[in-house]
Regions:
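A generic tandem-repeat structural signature
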Residues: 93-134, 138-140, 153
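All-beta strand scaffolds that present successive hydrophobic residues in beta-strands
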Residues: 39, 56-59, 86-89, 108-112, ...
């Protein structure tokens, strides 16, 4: 069982490696802006908070085995981020009570190639974000929305698969959003774009839904 390994990455950044038995949160705590955290296959029972800018969480998939964040129906959230320039890729996330990946005011984010199953109310939920990409994720068994873009601007939702959820993709009170190339099946609602009254951002426009 290994903890953290630090490798040189560039003059101003580093690569941190986490293996089964180690803590992803410990790596985030030690990381500086611009660092990459590589997480190897194994099961991790934790909530990861990222409040620094330009942090990348990259899962390493080996022989079909993924890094697996498992909330055991005890933890509320898997990954919470508020830093700008955040990216997360190649994680399996299951059995949380609230959210798989939730952003609060983080801009320039990228959420790609994740497998999200049975994570409570929401799967991927950026809120108050600008300039984001949600791409090539698979989400199922979500109690509310698998992908929920809330009060955000310039977000692309592309080539995701959402099935067996209450809602597949929701865009709420957001502007300049592209929803394209996704597959939504066996959801109560497939793709929804709407305005909810009483929220801080009152408008929704330039939402393009095509070729889904």
């Amino acid at each position: 069982i290994l903890g953290l390994i630090f490798l040189s990455h560039a003059a101003s950044s580093a690569v941190h490696e986490v293996k089964e038995g180690g803590s992803i949160q410990a790596a985030v705590t030690q990381a500086q802006s611009g660092d990459v955290i590589r997480v190897f296959p194994g099961t991790y029972h934790e909530t990861v908070y990222v409040d620094k800018d330009d942090i990348s969480l990259i899962g390493v998939v080996e022989d079909g085995q993924w890094p697996h964040l498992d909330g055991q129906k005890i933890l509320n959230d898997a990954i919470l981020y508020s830093g700008n320039g955040f990216s997360v890729e190649w994680f399996k996330i299951t059995h949380y009570k609230g959210n798989a990946i939730m952003g609060q005011s983080g801009n320039n984010f990228s959420i790609r190639n994740n497998w999200v199953i049975d994570t409570g109310l929401y799967g991927i939920f950026p809120e108050f974000g600008h300039n984001g990409l949600i791409e090539n994720n698979i989400l199922s068994g979500i109690e509310d929305a698998a992908i929920y873009v809330g009060m955000s601007d310039y977000v692309d939702v592309r080539n995701n698969q959402v099935f067996d959820n209450v809602a597949g993709i929701e865009v709420e009170n957001s502007r300049h959003v592209l929803v394209e190339g996704n597959v939504a099946r066996n959801n109560t609602g497939g793709i929804l774009v709407f305005i909810t009254p009483g929220l801080p951002i009152k408008s929704s426009y330039d939402a393009i839904v095509r070729r889904n």
